[in-house]
Amino acid sequence: MKTDLILNIETSTSNCSVSLSKGKNLIDLIEIDNSSYSHSENLHTFIYQILNSNKFSSEDLGCVSVSRGPGSYTGLRIGVSAAKGLCFANDIPLVSVSSLEILANSSNFNGIIIPTIDARRDEVYSSAFFQSNMISKEKPEIIVSESFIEYLKNNNIIIVGNGQFKCEKIIKK
């Protein structure tokens, strides 16, 4: 790796975000949450802005990290295509990260974290993590009142992500 400067791209949901990090330290973040999923209009502009405003170019990157889903198929294609183009042009590695893992690691909760991504209708993509370790498989799931029953007994849990309200309504029944 040329440097430890990482460009992170997330386009799996209605949120389009680009961030720069050095090692584990976040340098900058640009994001927009737009229900019209206008990632193709924003992503390349965000990449240019974040690099330019921090006095970097794509040649300074050590790698690019991109969300691999689950999530919006079109959003994922846009993010992965941009990431692959940058990596190919600069001969740097591409790292893919689970969208659910990104959500789980954004919380400092001491207990079981259930990241969710709305999959439309009555479905969400979900998984379960304990202290950054996945304890259940990523899967699309039709939410029913028993969906997370194995985690609700004697555990502190938090449900995060844009599918959380759908889960909360059904689980409380």
Residue ranges and their predicted role:
Residues 1-68:
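N-terminal beta-alpha supersecondary unit
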Residues 63-94:
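DPxDG-like acidic metal-binding loop motif
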